Amino acid sequence: MVLATLGSSPFVGNKHGTGEPNVLALHGWGRSGSDFDRVLVGTNALALHLPGFGSAGAPPEAWSPGDYAEHLASALVGHCQVTLVGHSFGGRVAIRLAARYPHLVQSLVLTGVPLIKRTAAKKAPVPFRLAKRARSLGILSESRMDILRNRYGSADYRNAQGVMRGVLVAAIGEDYFADAAQIDVPVTMVWGEWDQPAPLAGAQKALEYFPHATLRVVPGAFQLLEGNLEQELAVALHDALNA
């Protein structure tokens, strides 16, 4: 796979096709642009390795999905309009970009995007809550607090390093329905029936907000881009490009 940059920007990704990319694929948390290798067959596309993932260096500070969108918008100045394909975290970025910079976006194809702000199923364990309080008072050291975060945090949080922990915290504290209502381009949502990180109910709710959206449910599929979900995403992308 050939690596290429997005224009003269530092954004790098896997290049598909020989023409100027009119598809920009944005991967999920902890993943890379290589997730889209089969989805993008037959297209002119760039599957980015977002900063902090794959072969890309981490951002200089804890970027929110909106920050990723702002930097991508700068990189797309002078570029043709693109169809954004967003999976999970990449879909968060795609929605922010389409809402804030509609002139840059032709259409959206989304899958497995956590559209609703995550709420804790239960309170954090008492020792962790006490530790957070102690840290806020300056009683507990940051190194000790980090040990407790590793013990009590989610798998994604434990696996994230350095600034990427801040990126994760920023992302899970957001929802996207207000932005969805501002997006006037066609939106195709392709969802696994049993997606747990981004439940189908969130996508169904989003239909009330996106002005021009359709939802394709893939029976038996979960969140990872594999099997029938991967195939249906490729079909949806080609349909969007040929619309």
Give the label of every model feature segment.
Residues 1-23, 40-44, 77, 106, ...:
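Alpha/beta-hydrolase fold catalytic core
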Residues 9, 47-85, 235:
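Active-site loop/oxyanion-hole signature of alpha/beta-hydrolase fold enzymes
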Residues 14-57:
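Conserved HGGG/HGGXW glycine-rich cap/lid loop of the alpha/beta-hydrolase fold
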Residues 86-90, 94:
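Gly/Ala-rich beta-loop-alpha elbow adjacent to hydrolase catalytic centers
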Residues 95-100, 104-137:
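Flexible "cap/lid" loop of the alpha/beta hydrolase fold
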Residues 132-185:
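Conserved alpha/beta-hydrolase catalytic His-Asp/Glu region
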Residues 183, 189-191, 195:
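Short beta-strand/loop motif that positions the catalytic acidic residue
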Residues 221-232:
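Catalytic histidine-centered segment of alpha/beta-hydrolase-like enzymes
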